[in-house]
């Protein structure tokens, strides 16, 4: 996936579609797996709310 595909434009501003990894640093995006976000670099996983 290309970096420009991870952003979208809303009201003239760039907005990230996926969060950054809290362990790695800014610039390392987490992958969206439906029920969770996962970092492919360090393996950190963040579960989405199940509401």
Curated annotation (Swiss-Prot):
Organism (species): Methanothermobacter thermautotrophicus (strain ATCC 29096 / DSM 1053 / JCM 10044 / NBRC 100330 / Delta H)
A Gene Ontology cellular-component term: ribosome
InterPro entries attached to this UniProt entry: Ribosomal_eS31, Ribosomal_eS31_arc, Ribosomal_zn-bd
SUPFAM superfamilies: Zn-binding ribosomal proteins
Quaternary structure note: Part of the 30S ribosomal subunit.
Example of a GO biological process term: translation
Alphabetized Pfam families for the sequence: Ribosomal_S27
Name of this protein: Small ribosomal subunit protein eS31
Zinc finger (C4-type): 21-42
Ranges in coiled-coil conformation: none
Entry GO MF terms: structural constituent of ribosome; zinc ion binding
Family: Belongs to the eukaryotic ribosomal protein eS31 family.
């Amino acid at each position: 996936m290309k970096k420009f595909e991870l952003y979208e434009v809303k009201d003239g501003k760039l907005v990230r579609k996926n969060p950054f990894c809290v362990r790695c640093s800014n610039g390392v995006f987490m992958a969206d797996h439906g029920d969770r976000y996962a970092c492919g670099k360090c393996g950190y996983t963040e579960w989405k709310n199940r509401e």
